[in-house]
Amino acid sequence: MTSSEGPGIPAIKTPPVKLRGSCHACALSKLKCSQDKPTCSRCVKRGTACQYLASKRAGRKQGSKTGSFKSFYNMKTDYSTSINKDDDRRELMEVSTELMQYALQQDRSLEVYRRNQYHQRTPSYPESIPSLLSSTGPGTSATSPLTLGPPDYDGYLASPISLSLLDVPDMDYFPGADMSANVMDGFPDPPSFFPSGEPIPTLQENILKTSFADSPVPANSPSVPPTPDVTSVGTPRQCFCFPRALTLLRELFPNPSLSCVTPSSESGSASPPTVQQVITKNEQTLRDITEIIECSCSEDGYTITIITLAAFKVLAWYSAVAHISPISEDSQALEEIDRTPAVVRGYNIDGEDQGRMAAQLVLSELHRVQRLVGNLYQRLKDQVSGGKPARLSTTGVNDSNHYSLPFHLLERLAVDLGAQLRSLSSEIVDRLRRG
C-alpha cells in the first residue's frame, strides 16, 4: 500500500502490517496454535497449508484521515467561508455607496433646478417691483437702483401694501358677509343664522362652486386663468349635518320661554302644537337624527352632542303627550300641547280614558327612540374610546384632533339618555298598570 501526496496535503504514513497470533487453520478449529513460522506443528502433523493472515485492528479503518489532517481541512473551510462573507460585505458597501452617490447627485440637480427657477421668476415682475418699493416709505424712490438678493419678508409684512397692487379680482365668496370691525360689534345670535323662511341646505349643494359662479369680476381686471372646477381638484364634498342638527334642535322649541322677553317674542307667540303634530314631528326628527348618525361627519363631537340633546327633547315631548310630570315640580314645562283636537291617526283619545290612551300611544312610539338610543349610544361610546383613526376633515387637513369635547361629557350624555328612556318607559308602564 503506497502513500499518495496531493498539493498542499501532508503525506500519510502507512502503518506496518501485523500478523495474527494463530494461523488460519487453528483459528477456524478454535485450537491453540504453536505459532511456529512458516508452518505450525499442528499443520505439519495434519499436512495442511499453514497461513498467517493480517490482523484487523479495531477502531478506525486503514487509510482514514488523521486528526491533524481534519483540523487542517476544517481550518481551510472556515477561511474560505470568512473570505466569502468579506466579499459579500464589500459588495454591499459598494452598492450602498453607489446609491448614496446617486441620491446626492439627484439632490444637487434638484437644488440647481430650484435655483434656476427662482432666478427665472425674479425678473418677471418689472412693473410691480417699483410700485412695491415706492409704497414702503417716503424715503424710497422708484428710480433707485434695484439690488437682487434674498427677499426681506419681514419688510413686506410690515409695509402698508395695498392688495390692489397684486391685480387680484375682488371676488365676493359669501355675498352679504362684511368682515369689518363694525359688523363684528353687532354679531347676531346663533338662531339668526337659520331664518325660518330659508330652506335648509342639503348634502348635494356645493357652496364653493356656487360662490365662484356668482362672484362678480371687474371689467378692467387683467386676464386671469379660469378658475378650476372645485369637484375636479379633489375637494371633499361639503357636509351640512352640523347646521342640520342645530335646525332640528331649534325646531323642537316652538314655544318661547316665559322668562325670555325679546321684541320677537312680544310681537306674537305661536300656538302650542297638537298631539298629532307632536307625534308627527317626533317621527320626522328621529328619522333625521338617524340619517345624521349614519353620515361619516357624525364622528365630530359637536354634531353628536347636538343630536343627543335633540333626542332628549324628543323624549321630553313624548313625556308631555303621556301626561308625565316634569322632573322638578318647581320648574315650568316648556312642552305645552293643545289637546283639544284629541284625534291621532284616526283614533279619538278624548274622554275619561284620555290619559291612558295617550300613554299607550307614547309607549307604542318608544321603540323608535330605543333603536335610536342604541345607535347613538354606540356612536358616543366610539367617541369616548377614541379608537377611530384620524380622518380628513372638510378642509382637507388631517383632523386627528377632532375630538375636542371632553370625553366625560360625551360619556355622561350617553348614560343619561339611556336612563331617561328607561325612566319614561317605566313610568308609562306603572301608569297603565294602575289604570
Curated annotation (Swiss-Prot):
Pfam families registered for this protein in UniProt: AflR, Zn_clus
Disulfide pairings: none
GO CC terms: nucleus
Compositionally biased intervals (Low complexity): 130-147
Compartments (UniProt record): Nucleus
GO terms of biological process kind: aflatoxin biosynthetic process; monodictyphenone biosynthetic process; regulation of secondary metabolic process
InterPro entries, per database record: AflR (IPR013700), OAF3 (IPR050675), Zn2-C6_fun-type_DNA-bd_sf (IPR036864), Zn2Cys6_DnaBD (IPR001138)
Known DNA-binding region: 23-50
Region (Disordered): 117-147
Phenotype of the disrupted gene, per the record: Impairs the production of monodictyphenone and of any of the intermediates of the pathway.
Keywords annotated in UniProt: DNA-binding, Metal-binding, Nucleus, Transcription, Transcription regulation, Zinc
Annotated PROSITE patterns: ZN2_CY6_FUNGAL_1 (PS00463), ZN2_CY6_FUNGAL_2 (PS50048)
Molecular function as annotated in GO: DNA binding; DNA-binding transcription factor activity, RNA polymerase II-specific; zinc ion binding
Gene3D superfamilies cross-referenced by the UniProt entry: Zn(2)-C6 fungal-type DNA-binding domain (4.10.240.10)
Function of the molecule: Transcription factor that regulates the expression of the gene cluster that mediates the biosynthesis of monodictyphenone, a prenyl xanthone derivative.
Name the UniProt record assigns to this protein: Monodictyphenone cluster transcription factor
Designated gene of the protein: mdpE
